[in-house]
């Protein structure tokens, strides 16, 4: 723990020595010369090492705010456009009209099903299965 505190103090002292501070003086010329030297060190007057304005402007085309401005604003996306917001597409209706059953298409009746318990059973064994077939409603086996 003592070594950690010592390392932290040494790092703090090194950081304090590395960055020059503006010492108050009787004349203001010393402060302005320090500022001028800092500007010459950084290459651009008024920008610090931590300022990323130049990088941001070069990466996003010179826009000052947000993620960069676009030169052409995007049109609002209307509803019922198929797959895209481009203005050259025709609007698609919500449901295609059908001639006979509203918008759900033509009604088709269910496929007819018949009870055929003897399907695939040989003729001589059909009497064995007759007990399981209902004998009412016209089913005569």
Swiss-Prot record:
Q: Which UniProt keywords apply?
A: Disulfide bond, Extracellular matrix, Secreted, Signal, Sulfation
State the compartments where it is located: Secreted; Secreted, Extracellular space, Extracellular matrix
Locations of Low complexity compositional bias?
23-36
Q: Where is this region: Disordered?
A: 23-48
Start and end residues of each VM domain: 71-108
User: Which InterPro entries does the annotation name?
Assistant: Vitelline_membr_Cys-rich-dom
Kindly give the PROSITE patterns that the UniProt entry links to this protein.
VM
**What is the purpose of this protein?**
Major early eggshell protein.
> Family, per the entry?
Belongs to the vitelline membrane protein family.
Q: What name appears for this protein in its UniProt entry?
A: Vitelline membrane protein Vm26Aa
Native species of this protein? Drosophila melanogaster
């Amino acid at each position: 723990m003592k070594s950690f505190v010592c390392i932290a103090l040494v790092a703090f002292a090194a950081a304090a020595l590395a960055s020059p501070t503006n010492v108050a003086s009787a004349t203001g010329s010393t402060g302005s010369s320090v500022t001028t030297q800092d500007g010459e060190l950084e290459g651009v007057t008024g920008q610090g090492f931590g300022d990323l304005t130049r990088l941001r402007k070069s990466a996003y085309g010179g826009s000052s705010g947000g993620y960069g401005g676009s030169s052409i604003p995007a049109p609002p996306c209307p509803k019922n456009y198929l797959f895209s917001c481009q203005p050259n597409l025709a609007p698609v209706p919500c449901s295609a009209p059908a001639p006979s059953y509203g918008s759900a298409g033509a009604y088709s009746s269910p496929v007819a099903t018949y009870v055929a318990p003897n399907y695939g059973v040989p003729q001589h064994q059909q009497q064995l299965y007759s007990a399981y077939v209902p004998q009412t409603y016209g089913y005569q086996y």
